[in-house]
Amino acid sequence: MRPPPGSASAALGALLCAGAVALAAYASHVAEAAQAARFGMAAAFAFAHGIALIVLAPRRSSLAALVRVLVVLGVAGFSGGLCLAAWRGTGAPTAPIGGSLLIVAWLLAALDLWRRGDRR
């Protein structure tokens, strides 16, 4: 029996949310003040986009599949870049790329939702 379409995306979204909660706890209880803001921002973006992956998982269009891939890559670039920057104490060179991917993902999601309405 095959898993339903999008179940991997939904599972990844749930894992992103779990990681985001752990990261927020780290930011709140362990990180130094200078790091906490970056870790907190990374956690907020990872959590929000984890929920988005769960919500978008049932959509079956090829555009929705592209959106899910862009969300994963965008979160990796944005949140991952912020975390790396916080740990290293440097800039976050991948954050703008990740953020741009997230913007494109949301614009494509809007297009997919507009074209298909509430149909899945």
Residue ranges of predicted features:
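Core segments of alpha-helical transmembrane spans in multipass integral membrane proteins
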Residues: 15-23, 37-62, 69-76
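Alpha-helical transmembrane segments of polytopic membrane proteins
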Residues: 40-46, 96-103
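N-terminal signal-anchor transmembrane alpha helix
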Residues: 7-29
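Interfacial loop at the N-terminal end of multi-pass membrane proteins
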Residues: 2-3, 26-43
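Transmembrane helix-loop-helix
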Residues: 5-9, 59-101, 107-117
